[in-house]
């Protein structure tokens, strides 16, 4: 779900929200503790993904960090019952194609074969924790940054989730939180935010749309408006050069499938002006959703 390639001038689905892999293997825990779970500590960097091999299912909390200079993205996927991971990976390989029609077909195939259950964009200074409901079974942790850098040797690690005592249908939070909802509109996919005004408040991510979406949060120059973002992304979509409004590395939440939700806590995010964006390819056009208007300026104090 990384957008580095787009920002370097590559169009369409090369900046897809989901990575793929061909080889299986190799802060504060307050949010997880409030939900009665112990967090899964995940470190992702140039050496690979460090995480346990198994953990209790149900309400699962991932605590993600990196020491990589340019930051890292972790994406978690769960194949549907009976679907081999290699088939899912082939779907995702298509989803990150430079050809829009192939990218769209890849996203449709992925959504038929698996679920995106969340992810995290992290940097040296910003780590994250997200809690979501995942039933028993195997999920796969993917380093999407590694995929962009070396697509022939992507990195993925399996994680076996086993029976939970408290189930996986309980509410994620009873405490105050901000909300970011992904929704469909006549104009295309959009963000709806409620209470997203502080940099330290937990964020409830809800996918109420019909496709996979993400919520990147990236610092922009003070005074940047939604109109400025539209001009920038319109130029990029047309293959034109444009001055980037971004002044920092992306953080935020990775891809999540329709009907899913997660509670995200970002540690180390500074107050300021940020752009909320989604680069996941559309399942019909194959273009990143951000080219279709899925962006929004937010001011965090």
Regions found by a protein language model. Give the residues of each.
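Extracytoplasmic beta-sandwich strand-turn segments characteristic of Greek-key/jelly-roll folds
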Residues: 84-135, 225-267, 296, 300
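N-terminal, intrinsically disordered, basic low-complexity segments enriched in Arg/Pro/Ser/Thr
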Residues: 34-36
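Generic recognition of flexible, low-complexity loop/linker segments
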Residues: 191-192, 203
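Contiguous segments within soluble domain cores/interaction surfaces
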Residues: 66-98, 200, 206-236
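Non-catalytic alpha-helical scaffold/packing segments enriched in small hydrophobic residues
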Residues: 204-205, 268
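Extracellular/periplasmic metallocenter environments
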Residues: 38-57, 61-77, 112-188, 194-198, ...
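Secretory targeting and sorting signals
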Residues: 1-32
